């Protein structure tokens, strides 16, 4: 059983996803819930499916995913990154097209911290000339 299972870890913002690919019919389970049940937004569901649609393997694998931390956008990005890594473990020849689309690279952008004396990270208090 372990021979035909592929694993990938994905991260984005504060989210971490562990993705297990197994040969199957295209079922996607995230934290023991279906994809459309876990992500209400269609855009998040689309982001999760992107790497599979690119390499035309939507119906080839069942996915068991555990994801934690962050919000919906970060979790969707982390899952996409994890799926990409698992697909590369399955077949290294897929690295080229996935890299070209930008799915292999870890998006390193993080939230900028709030500074003292400012309202937010860069938003300054209103300036009064007089």
Swiss-Prot record:
Keywords: Ribonucleoprotein, Ribosomal protein. InterPro entries: Ribosomal_Su5_D2-typ_SF (IPR020568), Ribosomal_uS9 (IPR000754), Ribosomal_uS9_bac/plastid (IPR023035), Ribosomal_uS9_CS (IPR020574), Ribsml_uS5_D2-typ_fold_subgr (IPR014721). It holds the Pfam family Ribosomal_S9. GO terms for molecular function: RNA binding; structural constituent of ribosome. GO terms for biological process: translation. GO terms for cellular component: cytosolic small ribosomal subunit. Belongs to the universal ribosomal protein uS9 family. This is Small ribosomal subunit protein uS9. It comes from Idiomarina loihiensis (strain ATCC BAA-735 / DSM 15497 / L2-TR).
